């Protein structure tokens, strides 16, 4: 085993200029991450200098068997925390050979919104709170829970410490450090209300980079749980009953919101979000109706609400923002399995571009 470990950790730069690039994309379900690697002649730090690539789309539910080629367009580069050295992770989006974006390519439309001059001028910042649940591999049951049974009720687990409260911290901490190494703007982690559930935060990130960084962080988490023999679930309500669901609270501000008088801009933006509540809910993740019940720190899915420091509302404004008269707000509706490209661009579109 030590020889295998030695080989995995070989430093390629000692013998060659060549690097390994892991191309990553979103598969046909919209949540399944896929990747494959290729050798490149030397270090690359600009995605525009990376070659396009292709894969068998019929095996990812993205193309028919008789016309199966799908093209990968490199869009963002991160350092590879697994191979290290000059090796890289490459976030890609997917196109037909004719250059048309696939239906599962949510980045394409998001990039159009984020490149709109009105959006560019507002420099939208995002902070995404990605919740997830760690599961025991073969039984589809949360890490640390007794098989066929339940732990004690919620209360001691949120930000909890100790072997009877925190399950999977080694995975969480490994993921945290790997994301920092990769160059992802990860800003923190914490244990969540339901035992076996955790959260990491990405941001503040500007525009399209928020989506790139969340997908890269999800990929790294999938790889680490693979090594640990656990499974990560982004289901918004993995365990029915009196247990918290999993969300992806999305914190947001624009230049106008961050400047003097920004609180009035925030209130107008929230009003617009309320007018498009149904459209946002439809785009905020599958199965979200199981989570947004009005209980467990959620608002009811059918009703839009907002409030200061209210975690039972659709949108929450922080006390500091109210006090300072400027800042940001938190959209609490997105589910843990949301597509960050969809959510971030839709918030920008509604609050900046959409005219009621």
Swiss-Prot record:
User: Domain GS catalytic spans what residues?
Assistant: 106-356
Predominant location category: cytoplasm
Query: What reaction does this catalyse?
Result: L-glutamate + NH4(+) + ATP = L-glutamine + ADP + phosphate + H(+)
Q: Which GO terms describe its cellular component?
A: cytoplasm
Spell out the residue ranges making up region: Disordered. 37-66
Task: Kindly list the biological process annotations in GO that this record carries.
Answer: glutamine biosynthetic process
- SUPFAM superfamilies per the UniProt record, alphabetical: Glutamine synthetase, N-terminal domain, Glutamine synthetase/guanido kinase
Compartments where located: Cytoplasm
Domain of life of the organism encoding this protein? Eukaryota
Q: Where is the GS beta-grasp domain?
A: 19-99
Extra notes? There are at least four isozymes of this enzyme in P.vulgaris. Irreversibly inhibited by the herbicide L-phosphinothricin (PPT).
Listed name of the protein: Glutamine synthetase PR-2
Write down the species: Phaseolus vulgaris
């Amino acid at each position: 085993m030590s020889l295998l470990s030695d080989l995995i950790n070989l430093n390629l730069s000692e013998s060659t200029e060549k690097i390994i690039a892991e191309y990553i994309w979103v598969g046909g379900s919209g949540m399944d991450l896929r990747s494959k690697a290729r050798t490149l002649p030397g270090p690359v730090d600009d995605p525009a200098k990376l070659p396009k690539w292709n894969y068998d789309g019929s095996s990812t539910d993205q193309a028919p068997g008789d016309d199966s080629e799908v093209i990968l367009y490199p869009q963002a580069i991160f350092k590879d925390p697994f191979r290290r050295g000059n090796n890289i992770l490459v976030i890609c989006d997917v196109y037909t050979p004719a250059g048309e974006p696939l239906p599962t390519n949510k980045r394409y439309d998001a990039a159009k919104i984020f490149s709109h001059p009105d959006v560019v001028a507002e420099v939208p910042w995002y902070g995404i709170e990605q919740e997830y649940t760690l599961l025991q591999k073969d039984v589809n049951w949360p890490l640390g829970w007794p098989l066929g049974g339940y732990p004690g009720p919620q209360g001691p687990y949120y930000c909890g410490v100790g072997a009877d409260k925190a399950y999977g911290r080694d995975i969480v901490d490994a993921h945290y450090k790997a994301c920092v190494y990769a160059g992802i703007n990860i800003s923190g982690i914490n244990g969540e209300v339901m035992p076996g559930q955790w959260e990491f935060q990405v941001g503040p990130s500007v525009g399209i980079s928020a989506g790139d960084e969340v997908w890269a962080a999800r990929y790294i988490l999938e790889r680490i749980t693979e090594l640990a023999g656990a499974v990560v679930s982004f289901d918004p309500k993995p365990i029915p009953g009196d247990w918290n669901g999993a969300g992806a609270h999305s914190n947001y501000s624009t230049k106008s919101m961050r400047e003097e008088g920004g609180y009035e801009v925030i209130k107008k933006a929230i009003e617009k979000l309320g007018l498009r509540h149904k459209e946002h809910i439809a785009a905020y993740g599958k199965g979200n109706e199981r989570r947004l019940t009005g209980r467990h720190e959620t608002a009811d899915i059918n009703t839009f609400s907002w409030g200061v420091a209210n975690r039972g509302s659709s949108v929450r404004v922080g006390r500091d923002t109210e006090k300072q008269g400027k800042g940001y707000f938190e959209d609490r509706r997105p589910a843990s399995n949301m597509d960050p490209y969809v959510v971030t661009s839709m918030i920008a579109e509604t609050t900046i571009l959409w005219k009621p």
